[in-house]
Amino acid sequence: MRSATVVTRFICGAAFLLTLGWGIPVHAQLGVGEWVRTDATGKGMTMTVAACCKGGFRLTYRVPIANGQPPLILTVDLPMDGTEVPTMSAGKPTGQTMSARRVDDHHYTGVVKQNGQPYLTSNATLSADGKTMTIEDTLTGTNQKVIETWVKK
């Protein structure tokens, strides 16, 4: 069974990075919709991106859990202005926050904190057609990296 901390460690980099590039009107509709994580570590995870919060995005993750249990559902309302925002599960904060910055039209960077302490940095690259996002997550204080691949449905 995947714990919420392990799961969110691998998906939170994508949470805000996937949509960060669409915080300006020209790109506003590119990120909205359903995304599927296709790498081996995150296979089966989905993310729904919807507009919210004055030009930001609501991200809803569905994370498969072993033994036929219902999926873990995580939600974050991301204002897209670099503000730290909480990750929610069942309407309650998980103790995790996210913040992010857009570098350019196809590159994004961000930090995920757990209980106020940074534990994950992410660098993302959006494909030219806007249909694939590759994210390199690095655990704070280690050389451990996870490469995520998300594809728009």
What are these regions (language model features)?
Residues 1-8:
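N-terminal secretory signal peptides that target proteins for export/translocation
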Residues 5, 15-16, 27:
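Intrinsic disorder/low-complexity segments
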Residues 11-22:
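Bacterial N-terminal signal peptides
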Residues 27-153:
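Hydrophobic small-molecule pocket/channel-lining residues, especially in calycin-type beta-barrels
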